[in-house]
């Protein structure tokens, strides 16, 4: 009984010392746009991406508004009164303002989020921009969010411990590939029903993971033809060990059909080592396209299991 009472008291203290402190003193940090932001209140938070709503909730907070992927992709336990702002690329600004937020968590990579800055600032609403593609960027955001909520325990559990597990996997990968003559190589395809494009390693979740684990992304460096128009000639010249495909959008069946059509459109695809050796993988978009957040270690582990199977 004493333990239960202690837990309840600690929970109350966390709530009372979080944004209450921000109300009196403010909390200042630098966002992804290199702007100095001071948060005076975070009682009503709007997150412009489902992944950012996830981070805020992992930090012990609640949201009053967020994008539809918070429901569709992250399946967050949101109250019925949370405003659905629609798709993250075209959020409903009127609905956002009507939700009466005092703090908005936005993406520095989302043009619609950037365009709303002046409007929200003019209304006296604090807006901070974040950019998260790596575990360290996630940890940095978690630090800010848990400082605001006063939940250092969640920073340790959902931040520090997660990144520590990621580092263990990185160490295993470095030791593994140090014994090999050549590092494994991969072609990373981001596929929707309408288009399929190769992606480099910069600024996206899977690309950063591949580089982190020592995998050569054949679309990096001078291979612009692969990156810009998915040059089959360039892919054949590089002959990747793996092909990783990540779905964009919700129509998995249409994406698989588009990929099958691509591979069957030219028999040269079947000459690739990745295809001949059955090393073509459709990866979970929740782990490798969206931000995995507290599941970063799970994502790294799954990817390492695949690439370490290559003799």
Show the residue positions of the predicted features.
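Extracytoplasmic ligand-binding site segments that recognize negatively charged/polar headgroups
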Residues: 112-115, 128-144, 183-205
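Short helix-initiation/N-cap motifs at beta->coil->alpha
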Residues: 31-32, 82-94, 223-232
